[in-house]
Amino acid sequence: EIEIEDESLLYKNRIKEIYKDLDPNRFKLFDALPLEEYAKFYTLFDINLAYVEHNAFASCKSEIKVIESLHYGCIPVFSEYGGYKDFWRAAPDRVKHKNMAISVQSPGPWINAIGHWVENFEDGKRRAAQLKEYSDDIYDINKHCEDRLSFYLQRTEEFNEAQMNMIAQYVD
């Protein structure tokens, strides 16, 4: 039995296995960066891969990696799963392309999607900019403050009412 102290090593080894047949000069795996340097790595590449395993944990992940990559001008290629799938379903058809959201886990469709964007780079940048415009609109906190405040106030009222009902049970 082999004991592995770092679970990220398992992930890195899985990624290396998936891409073992590709030229190592064409891609690079990045370790986590400190917060102050986090966005820096997005400026290093044109195409962002946001792959998630198809499991219960990953199904709860948000779409943040896709949104971040769009913010920095990357062409996204991501798993059509979990939060990524929710984001993709909500996006208007005019900004979608089949080589952005990949619904299968096998390497073939991912390699084809990456190859498509390498060969059609300008179209990819244009489509990524359109998707960014959509995501910037729905993720701009300033455009949704009133809705959020209304939601919190409604929940506060419901909570207060529930507390009053609970107290009333003991007062009678």
Per-segment meaning from a language model:
Residues 1-2, 76:
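Hydrophobic/aromatic residues located in beta-strands of well-ordered beta-sheets
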Residues 3-42:
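Nucleotide-activated donor-binding/catalytic signature segment of Leloir-type glycosyltransferases, i.e.
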Residues 36-43, 48-68, 78-88:
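Nucleotide-sugar-dependent
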